[in-house]
Amino acid sequence: MSRRAVVLAEMGIKPVWKLRTKPRVETPSPSGPPANEWIPLKAAVSGCTKCGLHKTRTQTVFGVGDENADWMLIGEAPGAEEDRLGDPFVGQAGRLLDNMLAAIGLSRGKNVYIANVLKCRPPGNRNPTPEEVAQCSPHLLKQIELIKPRLIVAMGRFAAQTLLESDSSIASLRGRVHRYAGVPLIVTYHPAYLLRTLEDKAKTWEDLVFARKTMAGL
């Protein structure tokens, strides 16, 4: 059994079908922004007091990964473990995300950058307020400007609705290419949701295949 088949089986996706990929063509990697362009942004995020979330956070969760990535994954807001560790998508949800990436031939930190709409954890994991989103959005936009991803994957209802300024359900947003900040965007379920709703893992695999095909056509 191939590694991808093993990963898909671990995700609970059956039957396992083969993902067709085009032969990889080696091209020179584009040079990203100088490292010093990230320094003021990271400092601005870590010291941000623009909304009340700075009073209850343990630390900010800036984002992690390849700063020259083609793929950018955007989640909702940090949870308790993310707030404690300072990294997005950790714990069980993070392990599931790693399996999801492996299923389409990707891995965390290699041509993938992961961030959240919000950089601070809302108390009790409540949904962020419009004011909190408005204050934090410039940080995310600056990350996108520096990374210049070719494709964004919005993970979860809140992230998708916020980025697309829509109140539509994930079901109605899936399977289409949207745009955010000029970048093609695809919507799928959040890994934490999939831990509670196993039957939607197969739909997420469909989204990942669609994302891979979309990236191949860019």
Name the predicted role of every residue range.
Residues 2-218:
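A polyanion-binding, active-site-adjacent surface
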